[in-house]
Amino acid sequence: MNFLAIFWFLMMPPSDIWLSDFLKARTIAKENHQMILINFSGSDWCGPCIQMHKEVFEKDDFKAFAKKNLVLLKADFPRLEKNKLSTQQLKKNNELALKYNPDGDFPLTLLLDENLKVLKVWSGNPGLNSDEFVKEIKLILK
């Protein structure tokens, strides 16, 4: 049984989940020659963040595209006690915000190449559906 669980975990594509560790995301992006999509979010208090997740990131077409092309990295800053981050994770998110979101915009989504060059920034909820969001990324891929 343990072998099956390990095999299943190893076979999961890296972009099928939102990572929370920048170093891990960077390593995966380098190894697979993929872009990194960083999303700064307030998952339990930021209305536009919640809306963007529902209308873009939770949609099947976005997930299918991301699975093949992106490493997803979420820097969440929840406020409710029940969603409180570990001290270590909060420190990682704050360090990431200092570099990529110094103004504290929510939501803020960035597309980076495998060498960490910022290719595109979406400040706030851009009001795109998942198909439109994917099309914007595809234009950058060309």
Predicted regions and their residues:
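Sec-dependent N-terminal signal peptides
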Residues: 2-11
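A domain-start/cap signature at the N-terminus of enzymes
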Residues: 11-21
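A short beta-strand-turn-helix
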Residues: 19-36, 66
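Short active-site neighborhood of thiol/selenol oxidoreductases, capturing the structured segment around
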Residues: 32-46
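The canonical Cys-X-X-Cys-His
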Residues: 46-49, 109
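Typically the conserved alpha-helix immediately C-terminal to a functionally engaged Cys/Sec
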Residues: 49-65
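Thioredoxin-like thiol-disulfide oxidoreductase module
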Residues: 60-125, 129-132
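C-terminal alpha-helix
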Residues: 136-140
